[in-house]
A protein has these predicted regions:
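Soluble, non-transmembrane catalytic domains of enzymes that act on hydrophobic metabolites at membranes
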Residues: 1-12, 17-19, 26-27, 137, ...
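Conserved ATP-binding subdomain of kinase catalytic cores across diverse folds
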Residues: 18-122, 151, 155
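Active-site acidic catalytic loop and adjacent metal/ATP-binding pocket
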Residues: 40-46, 52-54, 148-193
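Short glycine/proline- and charge-enriched loop/turn segments
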Residues: 59-64, 128-133, 200-206
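Alpha-helix N-cap and loop-to-helix initiation/capping positions
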Residues: 69-72, 138, 200
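Conserved kinase catalytic-core helix
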Residues: 83, 87-90, 119-161, 165-166
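A short, local hydrophobic-aromatic micro-motif
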Residues: 92-95, 166, 206
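C-lobe/activation-segment region of protein kinase-like
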Residues: 177-238
Length: 238
């Protein structure tokens, strides 16, 4: 006698899009109008209990020589998340991404990512006394982790393009001698490929220097770790 197996119903991408589109949560980034459209981010608990973030966009596009008529920016962010994940750069886990035109032929687009459990903005970590609590050895390891993630990104010719300190998140796992710092990069909407790794590195690191509060000593440590991971010196980072 054959064994009958109950198959899970197949859900189309269009049905998943509609499901995520109708879900509502807490606004963590209120909808704002730019790029000729609207974009905002909500946080909510999915049906499986997972904390997720949904970026919801209407008519929010960018143009390039490949896409002269406009393309939803979440598709560029999806490409970056997938590309950086493949390079072992710590970024949010992609759950779903989709874009479709509505009846008026305007773009609707979604990007759904899993929350980075336990991660906080690095400046909030500093403000809460994380450096003092865990000590300088762990802080050096944090800088080393940040440098490694950035170097792997740039060696793949990816440029973050909006590398402000508020987009660097940190988590410490364990206590005492067993404590370990982990770093993640967020807000990849403007991330793009460059012709050379050096061009990507120079742009992002100069931008991070301008938009961070690292002391001169900490910055020099970060640059040292970065150049060791990148494999060569980058001029003009002092």
């Amino acid at each position: 006698m054959g064994v009958q197996v109950a198959m899970e119903p197949t859900i189309s991408k269009e049905e998943r899009f509609d499901s995520f589109w109708t879900q509502r949560g807490e606004w963590v980034e209120e909808p704002n109008r730019r790029r000729g459209g609207e974009s905002g981010v909500q946080r909510l608990i999915a049906d499986d209990g997972q904390l997720i973030y949904i970026k919801r966009q209407v008519g929010h596009t960018y143009r390039s020589w490949l896409h002269p008529f406009g393309r939803p920016t979440v598709l560029r962010e999806r490409d970056a998340i997938q590309g950086l994940s493949g390079l072992d750069v710590n970024v949010p886990k992609l759950i779903f991404c989709g874009a479709q035109r509505d009846k008026s032929h305007e773009w609707r687009a979604l990007l759904v990512t899993a929350a980075l459990d336990g991660f906080v903005e690095i400046e909030d970590w500093y403000a809460a006394g994380g450096r003092e609590h865990h000590g300088e050895a762990l802080h050096d390891q944090l800088l080393h982790e940040l440098a490694g993630n950035l170097a792997r990104m740039h060696k793949g010719r990816w440029q973050h393009s909006c590398l402000y300190i508020k987009h660097v998140f940190v988590r410490v796992v364990g206590e005492g001698d067993n404590a370990k710092a982990e770093v993640a990069l967020l807000d990849l909407e403007k991330c793009r490929r460059r012709l050379t790794a050096v061009a990507a590195a120079r742009h992002d690191l100069k931008q991070l220097r301008r938009h961070s509060s690292f002391t001169s000593t900490d910055w020099q440590k970060l640059v040292y770790f970065y150049q060791a991971a990148f494999g060569s010196a980058i001029k003009g980072l002092d």
